[in-house]
Amino acid sequence: MSWLSTISLAHRKLAALIFLLVLAFGAAVIPSIKQQVLPDLNLPVVGIVAADPGSSPAVVEQQIVEPLEAAVAGVAGIERTTSTSRQGAATVALFFTYGTDLTDAQAQVVTAVSKAAATLPTGVSPQVFVASTSDLPTLTLSVASSTMDQQELAGRVRSRVAPELERIDGVNEVTVSGERGRVVRVTPDPAKLAAAGLTVDALSAALAPLGRTRPAGTVSDDRSVISVQVGGPLAAPRDLEQLTVAPAAPGGDAGGRAARPVRLADVATVTVTEAPATSLTRTDGRPSLGVALTMGTGGSSAHISEQVHERLPDLRDALGEGAALTVVSDFGPSVRDSVQGLLVKGALGMVMAVLVIVLFLRSLRSTVVAAVSIPLSLVIALIVLWQQGLSLNVLTLGALTIAVGRVVDDSIVVLENIKRHLGYGTARAEAVRTGVREVAGAVTSSTLTTVAVFVPIMAVSGLVGELFTPFSLTVAVAMLASLVVSLTVIPVLAYWFLTPPPVGADPERFRREAEEAERNGWLQRRYVTVLHRSLAHRRRVLVFGVVTLLASVGLAGLLKTTFIGDEGGDTLTVTQRLAPGSGLGVTDAAAQRVEQVLSGLAEVESYQVTIGSAGGFGAAFSGAGVDTASFQVALAPDADPAATRDLLTERLAALTGVGDLTVGTGEAAQSLVQIALTGDDPAALRAATGTVVDALAGLPALRKVTSDLAEAAPQITVTADPARAGRYGLTDAVLAEVVGRAVQGRTVNTLTIGDARYDLVLDPGTDVPTSVDEVRALALTTPAGRVRLDQVATVDLVDAPTSRTRVDGEPTVTVTAEPAGTDTGAAGTAVREALDGVDLPAGVTWSLGGVNADQEEAFRQLGLAMAAAVALVCL
């Protein structure tokens, strides 16, 4: 490799210019490198979601989940399939092997699902999407107003705030949640309908095509052809009242009055109302909207945060008087603090390295020449990060910090050898060439050996590879850059800046004096003494080394282990789950009690609560219904997140009748231990779940143990009597349609009225039932006349599971435990020991998953990478 120095010395100015250009280019591109806490994680997961309002979990599983699972079974690369069936919704998650082309996988899944669409219930349209951590909001805002209603506020947010936020570099999408839309509700009068000879079905048929534009041919002449279309949007909701729902009867009526068309206003009332609430959002106790920003490819959480905070005053002004715009959660500050903290530590490491160089080289010129390799090598590594689209995060910055102490080694070796030959009286050019030639092989082999330690990590697959490949790449590039710098830039700088021997000096005298000075140096004298003693007691030294190695290996087992530690942050989360089947009002009342606790804590700067699912990434898989409330808690700048979490947990534990409360951090998913229980017998699975929860509940290593075993919720079942229902022309499908219309009405159209879109809802025309007895008493209109529901069907109130979960087609329950501390490895060991002595019902098996499975797989792969690194070093 000494040929590099020969070329550099022959073209010194060109070499210096090239590396100055490298520094300038680095200064231009490094600020654009995105900043994150952790690297982007491209999870190999394709999700399928489907909605079928009103269907029970059992029906969803049978009619939607099972056909979808069968349809995608032939897609290549699927490792595991999980599905959850809930009231009116199905979710299927397909886990592929890491390295799978998700674009191709998604296309295959879409094709498979489209083929199965014909077997699904009418109106069910599955949606396929690729899961990604970039779809998680990087920043969330809350918007409230004391002067505007929700619709007006939402309109201003969508027209004035969202477009401005979408212009921020790195923002992928801005979503607004919490808005209750408006519906046009048509409520028929049964008596007037009967007098006009109409039915609800006839009314529905008249409303269904309303507002559509239809082609009516063309008008042409010799010069042009003009198309004709009929229909268009309504100007106002009241225009509906003039809709003709039945033409005039020919010849007039029996009373001699002139016949006239039947207008909608003659048989029904038309009102504009808010859509039924399926979720509520409040910020600091006030009704609000949520605005979530997701980060696109190449985006930076820190940059997005800075830009949003800069725009907040203008955005508040754009919303108008009385509007409040608040940042609820923001990953930017924690990312910025993590990055800046590592930058400071890296800078301190660089300073310490320079001081050590001064101590040993005892020359300011030599120190400056050697120290040049540090920023130059790191800049080259950062340029590669930028070129690869990687980010500055705790792992890549940690890699740069590690590299600081190593990148200068090659330069010191080369520089010290050049300086030694200059001390021998050798001419400057010859001293540089000889000094580099003597150590080039050693420096190259040493650096390549060190790089070889990190290369196997780049071959690791899975989540570990996603996390540590940027780390190993950064270290490897920095060290290779240091090798190139030591063999090119350092010789040139040494030629220019190191003091040459005096002209006419006696080389032999200089060599003798230099060698004598080396022998009498304090470091060499002490080292030679230690070396002699070690060689005189070779066996003792070897035994000491072996004992030290074995002791180190033994002590490693005493270390705490965790997968991805908690980065802290300035946000907490609170999840509140009430009994299944709890209504929105019950959950709202319980959430208000939690809000009272939050508002009384000085450590809490702001909070937002969402009851039900407000949409966004993960909503499909969260299972959040109106019996669940989720809180985002922004802490005050001087608050201690860990202490505040403990205090909040203590305060909430004192509440009664508010459901199950869980306090967590606002960072990525917590380190939870999960136990998967699998079995075909629901009763055995339920019994096994109780046994496992009881076995783990008392373990000191665990803080909280829960399960996703679906609790029972009230459900009304209607079972048709084939004989009696058949006399009235009622099949199961017809009965479901008639009962559904009587219970909740139906959306028959979506209209554009003015600039807004409204769902057109046809009410049943009677009071909506609120109890099982009222459902039994429903009067159904059939072709054979009116009949009570309980005369043609059996109506029962039963308890039914609120959800059904399957893994690879088998019913599964997951027991989740939160470690009491940071040692997730110890928590997993305690769980294994506890469950090894538990007898589960026949047919039920358990397996450890969650963070422990991830951690074990990570340690296994990194262990193999370490073994491969040792093998490469020994080659």
Task: Go through each PLM region and give its residues.
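C-terminal transmembrane helical bundles of large multi-pass transporters
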Residues: 331, 657-875
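Hydrophobic, glycine/alanine-rich multi-pass transmembrane helices and their short helix-loop junctions
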Residues: 27, 355-360, 380-392, 444-490, ...
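Juxtamembrane segments of multi-pass membrane proteins
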Residues: 525-528, 536-654, 659-660, 671-674
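Membrane-proximal extracytoplasmic
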Residues: 1-347, 392, 466, 801-816
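Signature of alpha-helical transmembrane segments and their immediate interfacial
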Residues: 1-35, 439, 510-564
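Helix-loop junctions and hydrophobic alpha-helical segments within the transmembrane domains
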Residues: 328, 335, 339, 415, ...
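Hydrophobic transmembrane alpha-helices and their membrane-interface caps
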Residues: 29, 323-324, 352-359, 364-419, ...
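Membrane-water interface of transmembrane alpha-helices in multipass transporters/channels
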Residues: 36-42, 363-373, 386-403, 459-477, ...
